[in-house]
Amino acid sequence: MSFAPLTNDTFLRACRRQATDYTPLWLMRQAGRYLPEYKATRARAGSFMGLATNVDYATEVTLQPLERFPLDAAILFSDILTVPDAMGLGLSFAEGEGPRFAKVVRDEAAVAELAVPDMDKLRYVFDAVTSIRRALDGRVPLIGFSGSPWTLACYMVEGKGSDDYRLVKSLMYARPDLMHRILAINADSVAAYLNAQIDAGAQAVMVFDSWGGVLADGAFQEFSLAYTKRVLAGLNRTGADGQDVPRIVFTKGGGIWLPDMKDLDCEVLGLDWTANLARARAIVGGEVGGPGKALQGNIDPNVLFAPPERVAEQARAVLDSFGAPHTDRTTTGPTHIFNLGHGISQFTPPEHVAALVETVHSHSRALRQR
């Protein structure tokens, strides 16, 4: 499969811990409801799933934030719950309620019915990946993604989002054998799903462990991290264009487990806003010329509700907290990809995002001149 050559590879260079002219930036949920143009496209599509399952609409909304802001990567417009939907759990999005499943997985009989889905049921996702990659025309790289095995299990057991994760944790503690069976199937499903995205043209892939942070120490390592490792072990390392495909792992609330994640078989670790970038760099960032992880994050998304000058101030603080940028182009070293600590709020003023992007690019260039 051939695609246009990349004109801005800053994000991929940072993923590989290579020196860059500035700190690259993209935003979790950058294609979304804070953009009026997204709302207009969604209205035409009629529903969220109408948007996500239509290749033309998915391509259009993926590119919308790039038309507005000089971001350094695009991320596939989709949802983490497409995989359990393909398992036959019946995903729907009620207006104002978020996702829910018609079927839940809470007992032996339901677990026995689970299997890695036929990836052809997710063909709309892979067709969208190829369509977006072609539409980008080499402007910036395209990131594919999936939920983590644990995060998918949370929704599959609860049937929807949860405040206390009572049902999934009850199953985990009462019947760990069942939970391990769910997670093993999820891990193999996620690996197959991400590999199909890579084959379709994704240039990096990200595992969102959005609910890993709700677990107790010990439980996180057993029920979340172990299965993220299983996903990573099953991933293709080479993309459709013959280039290596960096892998990003983001665990919301996972900063306390950085020592456990130090040896994950991935290139980038995402951090939420509770983590200290300098401390994270010291634990996993590595030294110049040695092994390590690139770091991604981690400004509090709610900073974007402050006036633009405050947004700029906080963005500079995040860049400064990472420390001196790696500038030696002859070797690898600690690198930073700027992002939010979680997805952008639908109520965010777009002009505040513009202030963030401009500040990150200008201040990170200035840091490299010092």
Swiss-Prot record:
Q: What SUPFAM superfamilies does UniProt report for this protein, alphabetically?
A: UROD/MetE-like
Per the UniProt entry, the signal peptide is none
One GO biological process this protein is involved in is: protoporphyrinogen IX biosynthetic process from glutamate
* Residues involved in substrate binding: 29-33, 79, 155, 210, 342
| UniProtKB keywords | Cytoplasm, Decarboxylase, Lyase, Porphyrin biosynthesis
Q: Which reaction does it catalyse?
A: uroporphyrinogen III + 4 H(+) = coproporphyrinogen III + 4 CO2
EC main class here is: lyase
Q: Which InterPro entries match?
A: UROD/MetE-like_sf, Uroporphyrinogen_deCO2ase_HemE, Uroporphyrinogen_deCOase
Regions that span the bilayer: none
Kindly tell me the pathway this chain contributes to: Porphyrin-containing compound metabolism; protoporphyrin-IX biosynthesis; coproporphyrinogen-III from 5-aminolevulinate: step 4/4
For this record, the Gene Ontology CC terms, alphabetical, are:
cytosol
> EC number(s) per UniProt?
4.1.1.37
- Keyword Ribosomal protein present in the record's keywords: the answer is no
Question: What highest taxon heads this organism's lineage?
Answer: Bacteria
Q: Where in the cell is it found?
A: Cytoplasm
GO molecular function terms attached to this record: uroporphyrinogen decarboxylase activity
Which residues does this entry assign to the site Transition state stabilizer?
79
* Assigned protein family: Belongs to the uroporphyrinogen decarboxylase family.
Biological role? Catalyzes the decarboxylation of four acetate groups of uroporphyrinogen-III to yield coproporphyrinogen-III.
Q: What HAMAP family would the database entry show?
A: URO_D
* Subunit record text: Homodimer.
**Any idea what this protein is called?**
Uroporphyrinogen decarboxylase
- Organism for this UniProt entry: Delftia acidovorans (strain DSM 14801 / SPH-1)
